[in-house]
């Protein structure tokens, strides 16, 4: 039944408890199997006494006990031990180790791997036995003669078990090894549990006290107990002899069931005083024999079988009938299970009503026994007419008759009528009603009636009048417990807490309640005065003060001051006491249970009873960050003291502070991070090293041609960037646009060309074309007459300086010019020839001053529309008449000139572009061929470098630069060749 679970039944890791319990007289270590050098995570007191080391000194040392090696330790044995750890094997060794005081001792060392639920080896268990008396590594005077014999005799008498284990040591190597393997197998099957979370397991043939079968069985026993409580008083009072076979069989079956219950009680778990579930068969049997066994056995004797015989003496039959009352002791079963039944509200009400009816039944049996005893006077053999039985017989018409032949009184009411009348009287008396048709007349009857009325008034007032008060007073803690559980369940359901976390919360509440019994310790301590509160706190923390040597020199006042500051917390399995990164603000003492310290998903320490973890606050000035997680493996009781409270006490008791700082040793300091390497990481590094070793390394020397080539490219790029930064180039534009004139006329059949030029860049990377090339470019600009009514078109020519946008050379320049022509097509329709010529005749102001600053070497050569040939008019003086919108927004001071271009010039330009494009392709092909040769030479050199050099290195082949193909552009400036410049130039 879920509500009837009593005890701590949550899954927990009881590995450490099992090892300690099964190896209580052994010395052992636990090492982490997943960290390099297998550091020690736990050592028991036996090993500390055997080696002379403190537990804190042994922690994080190698499980191979390398810190105990000495000069006489066998190297081969050391290697075998390491191989056993490396291969995760089980093995045994005889090894010579040294104690802390450097005393050599022979140990019989057993190594066994511990696996988790995934069958992965996570820990190593190393057990040690002292065999120095049987193998002396050093021969001295004390080991000779009778002294050695006396020591050997004393050892044999004190440790016979050790002798039995070490008997095969003097045999051959084969037999010795076989016996060791047998011990390891026995160790692994019997002693070694798995390191995992698991529910409490019960041994075979043991029944859990809260399982469904045992719950059903308890309810059956409850019903049969009430049957016994009803029938036994009835049979004793009315002196019925079980002549009815059916009733006899039924009573016998009930007796058999109670006998079976006795057997089951020898195999049923129970809850210990600390809330733990006791499943050890020996403890269960001893507990039952000391408590309820005798009572249950007396209540199960078959008294009805004796009464069933015909020729049994009346006295003996009456005696055994009276002994049936002993069966009422079976009500103790109800008392011991009452806390189970009280889990249900309806069951409580039914039990109370049954108790009231059962008391009335018992009183009715007693009332009839009094009347039956007084109705006939055995001395005079006369009937008492004032008895309530005689009055009842007269009232119902069944009077008593005297049988003269037999000399006895006969007749009277039947037994059924007598029982009903007795129960009627007791019920009316218990409920304080009393109709009076059946009334006591004799003194004994009146005295019993008075007692019954007193009991009845108490029962009636208690059960029916104050049921709510009874529950509030008797079961206040239980009601509060169930109220808390209901609130927690509603909270978990409202906020949809995951199932796993919900189970942890419920288990923690149940376990905490079982430990504290619902008592608020702080509330109780607040009621007590200061002195009494300090005494109670010292008593509550007595385990901490008695077990740790750091508190031995503390005075009574110091202990009382510390005890008041201590807090006791209860942790369930899986609870995290510290998270990695949290502030360590408390010092924790483990009183019971076990915990694990996890750093980087590896167990670096296992803490048990008597261990201390936290931080050394008395030596540090700042709060520490927890470097690992501390998680409970089992139900744990921790006594903690906060940092501020501890420092306050230490500051006040300075003498104790020195002793405390010197004697308290932390088993695990959460401030210091443990440096370790995982075995898996080491294996990965080894695999990576082997992989890199097998790979061919491609290393290019400093004087390699490839390095020199890229270094040359880098230098050229730096020089080009430096030259561009020193100069302030200006963009020139050749732009043809249609401009409206004042008279609204338009220029037809002409093309207007705007020519401008910037100052050439004077760097080592570029040079200006010769005047012949410039003149040739100027002669190419000729006037073409438009065909028919063709619209005037303008050609936009960019600067001769080659930019990275690709507008300065070849067919790409023509493409951009045509794009600009299409964009300005709408404006050209409104420009007339007269307007164009008018623009040419205007002389803007300030042209002379501007010409003095900037000189344009270009001149107008031909103008078919104006009839002027070989004009000396400078182009840079004819651009002032245009509107401000025609000027470049970035270069407002650049002068513009206009002249018409014939249509044949466009064809000439196309031919030139075609020729230039062909030259560019040829140049690109030559450069690609040269690059292919260079790459082939590089690969050849690299392949030669990968082979070991046995002879002198071959001379390097110089890189050949392909011949430069002359390429001319109309408005272009050449520069040194480089990969980047080629990329910029050939970007189409």
From Swiss-Prot:
Q: Give start-end positions of Polar residues composition bias.
A: 723-741
Specify residue ranges for compositional bias: Basic and acidic residues.
Answer: 871-885
Query: What are the record keywords, sorted?
Result: Calmodulin-binding, Glycoprotein, Ion channel, Ion transport, Isopeptide bond, Membrane, Phosphoprotein, Potassium, Potassium channel, Potassium transport, Transmembrane, Transmembrane helix, Transport, Ubl conjugation, Voltage-gated channel
Q: Which residue numbers mark the cross-link Glycyl lysine isopeptide (Lys-Gly) (interchain with G-Cter in ubiquitin) in this sequence?
A: 785
Domain of life of the native organism: Eukaryota
**Positions occupied by motif Selectivity filter:** 432-437
**Side Cytoplasmic, residues:** 1-217, 265-291, 341-346, 468-988
Q: What GO terms in the biological process aspect are recorded for it?
A: potassium ion transport; regulation of G2/M transition of mitotic cell cycle
Q: Sites of glycosylation? A: 403
Residues on the membrane's Extracellular side span 239-243, 313-319, 368-419, 441-446
Q: Where is this region: Disordered?
A: 721-741, 838-893
Presence of keyword Ion transport: yes
Limits of the PAS domain: 14-86
| SUPFAM superfamilies, per database record | cAMP-binding domain-like, PYP-like sensor domain (PAS domain), Voltage-gated potassium channels
- Chain ranges of the PAC domain: 91-143
Which PROSITE patterns would you find in this protein's record? CNMP_BINDING_3 (PS50042), PAC (PS50113)
**TM regions (residue ranges):** 218-238, 244-264, 292-312, 320-340, 347-367, 447-467
Question: What do the Gene Ontology cellular component annotations say?
Answer: cell surface; voltage-gated potassium channel complex
Quote the InterPro entries the UniProt record gives: cNMP-bd_dom (IPR000595), cNMP-bd_dom_sf (IPR018490), Ion_trans_dom (IPR005821), K_chnl_volt-dep_EAG (IPR003949), K_chnl_volt-dep_EAG/ELK/ERG (IPR003938), KCNH_animal-type (IPR050818), PAC (IPR001610), PAS (IPR000014)
Q: Where is this region: Calmodulin-binding?
A: 704-715
According to its record, what is known about the domains? Contains a voltage sensor domain (VSD) formed from the S1-S4 transmembrane helices, a pore domain formed from the S5-pore loop-S6 domain and the C-terminal cyclic nucleotide binding homology domain (CNBHD).
Q: Which family does it belong to?
A: Belongs to the potassium channel family. H (Eag) (TC 1.A.1.20) subfamily. Kv10.2/KCNH5 sub-subfamily.
Q: How does it assemble?
A: Homotetramer. The potassium channel is probably composed of a homo- or heterotetrameric complex of pore-forming alpha subunits that can associate with modulating beta subunits. Heteromultimer with KCNH1/EAG.
Name this protein carries in UniProt: Voltage-gated delayed rectifier potassium channel KCNH5
